Every structure is written in structure tokens, then in C-alpha cells.
């Protein structure tokens, strides 16, 4: 089940709010400029499906987002517990960073924890299958895929380079709860 946990940035041990209804999650995130929607990921995706197969299965939704927001690059990130670089990738994504463009993810399968550091608050968004999240450009955040990752997500970008992070050097992510496997 998708969820949103809100903390004050200096109190990672004490949540201010815990939400589990999609409408409540979406409205709370909308207040800080983050888009969250539930989509029907009804197209079957076989285990080990190629990037092209995943993109083809969701072509209608992808094209709508591209038209709506001007995204030009689409790819698929797919990680599971057998991935040889899972520990290195997890460590990289767990460092607080920002992007010069929106970070858009549509979860086709599995789950991941997007944690957003906005002003004095931290918003931990557990995204699962059928969740779309769009994090505005410049938003400090990190992502946890867990020790035993399992997710497939479509990513959309405004630039042809794809995922380009600007790391903040802040160790705040180390003080907040991680995705529990």
C-alpha cells in the first residue's frame, strides 16, 4: 500500500503525519508542488521484459505525459535482488540530490521510497505499482530501493541526457528511516 509519512527535518524519529489513502497523499503532496497519482498499470509485463516492451505496454500513458509536460526522453529502470550493482546503486540514490528538471516515475511493478526534503519538512513517499510521482526540478530528495530491490519504473525526462543529479553533500538521508524489506 502506498503511503506518505511527513517529518520535521530535525525529528526523524517522530512522524508528524502518516497517510495511506491515495487522495490524501495526492492532496498533501500537491500543497508542496509534487504530483502523485494512481494509474492502472493493467498491461501485463513479463519478468525480464525489455525496456522496449515496457514502454510499448504503457505507450498511451507515456505519450500523454510527454504532450502534457514536454518530456523528450523515456527509459525504464528495472532492479531486482539479483542485480550485481544493487548495493552501489542504492548508495548513490540514497545521497540527497536534486535535478535541473522534474523527476517523473511511473511504477509498473514493485516499490521504492522517494524521500523529499522541502523547506523544513521531509516527505517519505512509499511508491508502489500503479503510482506516478513527479518531483519538481530543484527539489532536494533521495530514493531508497531497499536491500533487496524489486521495482520496474518508467522514467521521463526533459533532457536527452536522462538522469543527471546534483548532490547536495548533506547527510540528512542517513538520519531517516529506510525502505524496509
UniProtKB/Swiss-Prot annotation:
Residues bound to Ni(2+): 97, 99, 103, 141
Gene3D superfamilies: Jelly Rolls (2.60.120.10)
Catalytic activities: 1,2-dihydroxy-5-(methylsulfanyl)pent-1-en-3-one + O2 = 3-(methylsulfanyl)propanoate + CO + formate + 2 H(+); 1,2-dihydroxy-5-(methylsulfanyl)pent-1-en-3-one + O2 = 4-methylsulfanyl-2-oxobutanoate + formate + 2 H(+)
EC number per UniProt: 1.13.11.54, 1.13.11.53
SUPFAM superfamilies registered for this protein in UniProt: RmlC-like cupins
UniProt GO BP: L-methionine salvage from methylthioadenosine; L-methionine salvage from S-adenosylmethionine; methionine metabolic process
Class of this enzyme: oxidoreductase
One Pfam family in the UniProt entry: ARD
Marked site (May play a role in metal incorporation in vivo) residue numbers: 96
Top-level taxon: Bacteria
The protein's name: Acireductone dioxygenase
Natural source organism: Pseudomonas aeruginosa (strain ATCC 15692 / DSM 22644 / CIP 104116 / JCM 14847 / LMG 12228 / 1C / PRS 101 / PAO1)
Amino acid at each position: 500500500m502506498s503511503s506518505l509519512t511527513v517529518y520535521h527535518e530535525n525529528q526523524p524519529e517522530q512522524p508528524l503525519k502518516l497517510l495511506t489513502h491515495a487522495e490524501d497523499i495526492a492532496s498533501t503532496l500537491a500543497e508542496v508542488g509534487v504530483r502523485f497519482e494512481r494509474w492502472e498499470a493493467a498491461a501485463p509485463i513479463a519478468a525480464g521484459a525489455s525496456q522496449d516492451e515496457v514502454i510499448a505496454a504503457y505507450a498511451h500513458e507515456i505519450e500523454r505525459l510527454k504532450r502534457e509536460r514536454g518530456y523528450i526522453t523515456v527509459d525504464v529502470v528495472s532492479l531486482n535482488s539479483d542485480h550485481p550493482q544493487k548495493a552501489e546503486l542504492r548508495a548513490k540514490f540514497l545521497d540527497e540530490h536534486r535535478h535541473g528538471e522534474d523527476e517523473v516515475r511511473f511504477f509498473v511493478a514493485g516499490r521504492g521510497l522517494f524521500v523529499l526534503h522541502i523547506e523544513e519538512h521531509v516527505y517519505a513517499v512509499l511508491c508502489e505499482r500503479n503510482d506516478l510521482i513527479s518531483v519538481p526540478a530543484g527539489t532536494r530528495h533521495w530514493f531508497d530501493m531497499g536491500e533487496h530491490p524489486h521495482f520496474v519504473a518508467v522514467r521521463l525526462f526533459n533532457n536527452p541526457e536522462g538522469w543527471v543529479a546534483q548532490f547536495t553533500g548533506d547527510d540528512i538521508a542517513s538520519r531517516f528511516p529506510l525502505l524496509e524489506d
